[in-house]
């Protein structure tokens, strides 16, 4: 068995329908230099059994939470147990592509950078199962073409990759900067991603697709519940806090790029939901956020397309 150089942290709660595919995608990696920490976050379905059976393999370690604590706390608990030089994350409803770890480990090992970022695609439900979509433009902008030893200032578009997974980083980097995920809220990875970019001495990006991000057929994932007010509050807070991290680091170009992407990609679906939502609080939160970002965009000369601008102009009157 190869000596592990990377720990894969896999948190999950009630993901029995998807966890077997996630774990199989890890076992099928072309690289064998990994170990994994599974975090069962208070599951009440078969996730506990699936994780327990996986842990019979020495490469897997299992952490159990009797009471759900959320993704942030689950990832933090696993981070405390990492003993390998490198660490990465995979959500238990997503999948790795076969060469994911090989490409990420090779890149960061050869470059000496603090972190490396890969591309990802959506897995969407189809007639005969899940169908892999294309690399979206904002994902491609952050990871293509390949770069080694770059920085956020040199490559501000990398700030558009705000997920915990699809990256590999050095555990020493986490511990040197006391990086932790916020606990008790959703979209906890956005602010951590921006902190990583602002703190990294060097960043690698590769255009290779390393993760398939699942859109669950049953609509049960957090990102599929943006019509709920509590989810909206955490979502808006995460986006706002992420931009604030960039501002605090004087990363003006990256902050402007992030504002543009939020206005172009994140806010239009929220505006459409708000236009028919039965809770006036939802519309008020979206309207406040749109006005805040629009003012910021005007000051930074950030442009969005005509259709998006019309939608945002209407929302700014709420």
Question: What are the roles of these predicted feature ranges?
Answer:
Residues 215-318:
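C-terminal subregions of glycosyltransferases and related glycan-biosynthesis enzymes
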């Amino acid at each position: 068995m190869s000596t592990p150089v990377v720990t894969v942290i896999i948190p999950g709660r009630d993901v029995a329908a998807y966890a077997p595919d996630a774990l199989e995608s890890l076992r099928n990696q072309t690289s064998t230099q990994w170990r994994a920490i599974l975090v069962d976050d208070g599951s009440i379905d078969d996730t506990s059994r699936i994780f327990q059976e996986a842990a019979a393999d020495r490469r897997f370690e299992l952490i159990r939470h009797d009471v759900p604590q959320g993704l942030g706390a689950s990832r933090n608990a696993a981070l405390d147990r990492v003993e390998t030089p490198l660490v990465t994350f995979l959500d238990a409803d997503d999948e790795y592509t076969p060469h994911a770890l090989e490409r990420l480990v090779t890149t960061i090992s050869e470059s000496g950078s603090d972190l490396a970022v890969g591309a990802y695609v959506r897995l969407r439900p189809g007639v005969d199962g899940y169908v892999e979509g294309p690399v979206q433009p904002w994902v491609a902008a952050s990871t293509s073409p390949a770069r080694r030893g770059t920085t956020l200032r040199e490559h501000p578009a990398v700030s558009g990759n705000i997920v915990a997974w699809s990256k590999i980083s050095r555990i020493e980097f986490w511990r040197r900067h006391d990086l932790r995920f916020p606990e008790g809220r959703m979209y906890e990875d956005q602010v951590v991603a921006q902190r990583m970019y602002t703190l990294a001495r060097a960043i690698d990006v590769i255009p290779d697709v390393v993760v398939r991000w699942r859109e669950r057929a049953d609509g049960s994932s957090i990102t599929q519940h943006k019509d709920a007010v509590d989810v909206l509050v955490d979502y808006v807070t995460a986006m706002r806090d992420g931009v604030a991290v960039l501002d605090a680091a004087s990363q003006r170009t990256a902050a402007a790029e992030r504002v543009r992407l939020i206005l172009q990609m994140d806010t239009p679906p929220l505006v459409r939901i708000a236009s028919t939502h039965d809770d006036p609080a939802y519309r008020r939160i979206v309207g406040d956020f749109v006005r805040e970002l629009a003012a910021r965009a005007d000051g930074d000369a950030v442009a969005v397309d005509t259709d998006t601008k019309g939608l945002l102009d209407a929302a700014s009157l709420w």
